[in-house]
Amino acid sequence: MLFGGHCPGGIKKALDNAHAFGMDAVQLFVQSPRAWRFPEHDPGDLKAFRKRREELGIQAVAVHALYLLNLASPKKDFYEKSVTTLRSTMDAACAIGAEAVVFHVGSHLGDGFEPALERVAPALAEALERCSDTTWLCMENTAGTGGTIGRSLEELAALYEALDRHPRLGVCLDSCHLFASGYDVTDRGELDKTLAQLDDLIGLDRLRCLHVNDSKMPLGSNRDRHDNIGEGLMGEGLGVFLAHPKLKGLPAYLEVPGTDGHGPDAEQTKKLRELYARATKASPAMPTSGRAGSARASVGNDRSTRSKSAGR
């Protein structure tokens, strides 16, 4: 398991923040999360990111797409801005050598899933055309609020099939979202069933990363409210999800409020490691700085060789 979190600072500072927090992996934005305007990144900054990553031994990098994106929107202007921004995000992620771009599909705004699917599929196809050999485009499951797409594994599978099982279309599972949408991943038996369903519908080889968050809201509430490690309703049960053997080796990114309300930090990273240690009855996993090459191969190439796309 690689322990990381969503860190501030963008391309210039996120790596150093992650390192200071004792993380093995980092998730970041490559633009302001609150604005549509996409910056023109200096090629020197993109190159410097790759070099700094090697220096710090950060083993996995994910870029989170803009929260404003709505690839399912029936509103033409909003939809077109979303498609353009996702393309630009993919370009930047490939340039810095990120293993994944994680995105929220969006909401059909009451228009229904099937009409939305007809909009989402070509948008994803455009983004995937820009995908490098090492960067995955990862659909994130949702808590199921309103008309959001991705509330169930079946909805993610429908997108996967609509894209003809594209070899670089992956999945990011968020523990809080799973719990809120009715998947009790704090129970080993239920988690086994969930992962078996994912394997059957899409393939576990397509699961590229995790968001590990506790939940302020109860099971099946369809409300997306992340909580700090050990402070929410999932509690110690979050360790069941974190330590499942079929998730071994994946980057686990925190997206929690943080000790001081400013997001993932050193204290939350420590609690995540300790929870994993208790769940696996082992000593707390320590930062593995300096082993970036081997870990990157484990996260990327080793898992991709197990792809089921040819046989499905």
Please give the residue ranges for each predicted region.
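N-terminal pre-domain/capping segments
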Residues: M1-A65, L69-S88, R278-R291, N301-S304, ...
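C-terminal helical cap(s) of enzyme catalytic domains, especially alpha/beta-barrels
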Residues: H262-A279
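Active-site acidic/histidine proton-transfer and metal-coordination neighborhood
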Residues: L71-G170
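Gly/Pro-rich active-site loop or hairpin
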Residues: E114, I149-A157, F179-G249, P257, ...
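Acidic (Asp/Glu)-rich catalytic clusters
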Residues: D16-M23, H41-A62, T89-G97, E126-T134, ...
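Non-cysteine beta-strand/loop elements that form the S-adenosyl-L-methionine
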Residues: D24-F29, Q59-V63, L169-S175, L204-K216
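Active-site beta-loop-alpha junctions enriched in small/polar residues
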Residues: H6-G10, Q31-P33, L66-L68, G106-H108, ...
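Conserved, mostly hydrophobic/aromatic
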Residues: A18, H64, S82, A93, ...
